[in-house]
């Protein structure tokens, strides 16, 4: 039997259908993919696209708009692009690339887009921030006057780093650049400084080893690791440094101190060169694009020490009376010690000083292989702790005199007493600057070692026994002068009482002969 509907039921059904119809119009700017090659997509028909805007592609894939041309847009795909085809629809999103930020990222390993890759589950933060941001202006900055202790005697005494400084670590491959940066991160344990380690274009096995070392030394808890491995696209390697910087800025903006390591910017420049050439931008010196200086300057200028007013304004009055800082340690790899190449000279001119590591010193067993002659810190001197500043003046002079005399002494058969003493002192200072990896040194221990060599207490100690003597001296002071060591570590001060205790303690230890 056929079902009959009343006219009233029919009108009710029609009304219900009409109510369910969505009338809200969504304005979408769409275009068509005309070519896909090497991670670059060209899109025809997109209008009103922003520089750096996210473009939505099929299968939840996104691309970053970099080339805005008259009739097309050149964009670099973030992630896998093998499923993309000519004729696919591309849509604008109206937003620029953002990454997750917050303390929840500490202890985690994420990729360049802030997605966790360590198998520890979701990040648990809803906060995001744009990867590109204008650096704080001059008005909002404060002078660098607080130290960042790296735990290296040679760096903290001769090339001190301050909070908010940019200090370049430069040298050939296999000279200990990453080791120095990782030790600096490990040494921030207990200081309140949060760390971000950005690995650009490194092997996944190398990054896994670094994460393991950080965990073993109790440093992963205060560190975010951003990994863009060698197997990832050039786009991910290019963007990773900016993503890491955004994560570090979160702490700076809220009146905290952060340290970021870019390892290394040479590989980022190569990735950017690859993207630029694929986008058919005109090449310049060494085939780099014309804006490769801006690539690094806009990144490194974001490292700063910001004023109390900046923090108060940013947090809308929630945090008052606190300055924030982001200290940057960019790493550059040179080829055969050539610091006059394009990218090294660029980064040297942007940063506030450089630590130059030499292959010859490294191979001679002087590690860290710091060349004190051409390494410099332009602003860190005012940030040095009082005790190290007071004691370290003689170190640089001793090394400079030693280098000058050592070259001269090769040709001279008989040396006068004063010259011989200077050479011997220089030998001992050079030996004393050696340090093992993953063994950062406290302020008190550094001060003890420097004081002992400056005051001539090590002149009668054989050079091959120096490091054993130093180790024994530190242990002796830890056992007999624990309070003094804690006081020096806490305050970094220097007075007659501390000097008297140092003199007495070193003399006592020398009489024991237990090294």
Swiss-Prot record:
Produces ATP from ADP in the presence of a proton gradient across the membrane. The alpha chain is a regulatory subunit. It is a peripheral membrane protein. This is ATP synthase subunit alpha. It comes from Stenotrophomonas maltophilia (strain K279a). InterPro entries: ATP_synth_asu-like_sf, ATP_synth_asu_C, ATP_synth_asu_C_sf, ATP_synth_F1_a_nt-bd_dom, ATP_synth_F1_asu, ATPase_a/bsu_AS, ATPase_F1/V1/A1_a/bsu_N, ATPase_F1/V1/A1_a/bsu_N_sf. The record marks 375 as: Required for activity. PROSITE patterns: ATPASE_ALPHA_BETA (PS00152). Keywords: ATP synthesis, ATP-binding, Cell membrane, CF(1), Hydrogen ion transport, Ion transport, Membrane, Nucleotide-binding, Translocase, Transport. It is found in: Cell membrane. F-type ATPases have 2 components, CF(1) - the catalytic core - and CF(0) - the membrane proton channel. CF(1) has five subunits: alpha(3), beta(3), gamma(1), delta(1), epsilon(1). CF(0) has three main subunits: a(1), b(2) and c(9-12). The alpha and beta chains form an alternating ring which encloses part of the gamma chain. CF(1) is attached to CF(0) by a central stalk formed by the gamma and epsilon chains, while a peripheral stalk is formed by the delta and b chains. GO terms for cellular component: plasma membrane; proton-transporting ATP synthase complex. Pfam families: ATP-synt_ab, ATP-synt_ab_C, ATP-synt_ab_N. One of its GO terms (molecular function) is proton-transporting ATP synthase activity, rotational mechanism. ATP binds at residues 171-178. Its EC number is 7.1.2.2. It catalyses: ATP + H2O + 4 H(+)(in) = ADP + phosphate + 5 H(+)(out). NCBIfam families: atpA, PRK13343.1. Belongs to the ATPase alpha/beta chains family. PANTHER family: ATP SYNTHASE SUBUNIT ALPHA, MITOCHONDRIAL.
């Amino acid at each position: 039997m056929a079902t009959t509907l009343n006219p009233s039921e029919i009108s009710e059904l029609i009304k219900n259908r009409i109510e369910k119809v969505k009338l809200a119009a969504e304005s979408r700017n769409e275009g068509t993919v005309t070519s896909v090659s090497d991670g670059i997509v060209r899109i025809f028909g997109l209008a009103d696209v922003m520089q750096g805007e996210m473009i939505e592609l099929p299968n939840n894939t996104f691309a970053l708009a970099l080339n805005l041309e008259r009739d097309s847009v050149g964009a670099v795909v973030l992630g896998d692009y093998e499923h993309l085809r000519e004729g696919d629809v591309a849509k604008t999103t109206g937003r620029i690339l953002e990454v997750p930020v917050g303390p929840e990222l500490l202890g985690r390993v994420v990729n360049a887009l802030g997605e966790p890759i360590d198998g520890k589950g979701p990040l648990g933060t809803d906060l995001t921030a744009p990867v590109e941001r204008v650096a704080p202006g001059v008005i909002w900055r404060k002078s660098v006057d607080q130290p960042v202790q790296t735990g290296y005697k040679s760096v903290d005494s001769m090339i001190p780093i301050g909070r908010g400084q940019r200090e370049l670590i430069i040298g050939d491959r296999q000279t200990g650049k990453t080791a120095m940066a990782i030790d600096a991160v490990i040494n921030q344990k207990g200081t309140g400084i949060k760390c971000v380690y950005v690995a650009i274009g490194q092997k996944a096995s190398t990054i896994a080893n670094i994460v393991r070392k950080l965990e073993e030394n109790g440093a992963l808890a205060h560190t975010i690791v951003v990994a863009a491995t060698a197997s990832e696209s050039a786009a991910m390697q290019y963007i990773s440094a900016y993503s890491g910087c955004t994560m570090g800025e979160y702490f700076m903006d809220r009146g905290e101190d952060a340290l970021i390591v870019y390892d290394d910017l040479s590989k980022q420049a190569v990735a950017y060169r690859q993207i630029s050439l694929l986008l058919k931008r005109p090449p310049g010196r060494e085939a780099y694009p014309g804006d490769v200086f801006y690539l690094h300057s806009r990144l490194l200028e974001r490292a700063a020490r910001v004023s109390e007013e900046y923090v108060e304004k940013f947090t809308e009055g929630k945090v008052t009376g606190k300055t924030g800082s982001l200290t940057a340690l960019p790493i550059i790899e040179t080829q055969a010690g050539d610091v006059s190449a394009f990218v090294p000279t660029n980064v040297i001119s942007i940063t506030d000083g450089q630590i130059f590591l030499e292959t010859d010193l490294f191979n001679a067993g002087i590690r860290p292989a710091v060349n004190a002659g051409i390494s410099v810190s332009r602003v860190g001197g005012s940030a040095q702790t009082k005790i190290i500043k007071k004691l370290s003046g003689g170190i640089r002079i001793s090394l400079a005199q030693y280098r000058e005399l050592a070259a001269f002494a090769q040709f001279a058969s008989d040396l006068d007493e004063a010259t011989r003493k200077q050479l011997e002192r220089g030998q001992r200072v050079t030996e004393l600057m050696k340090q093992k990896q993953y063994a950062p040194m406290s302020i008190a221990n550094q001060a003890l070692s420097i004081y002992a060599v400056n005051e001539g207490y090590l002149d009668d100690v054989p050079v091959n026994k120096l490091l054993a003597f130093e180790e024994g001296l530190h242990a002796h002071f830890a056992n007999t002068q624990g309070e003094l060591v804690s006081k020096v570590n806490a305050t970094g001060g220097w007075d007659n009482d501390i000097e008297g205790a140092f003199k007495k303690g070193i003399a006592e230890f020398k009489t024991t002969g237990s090294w």
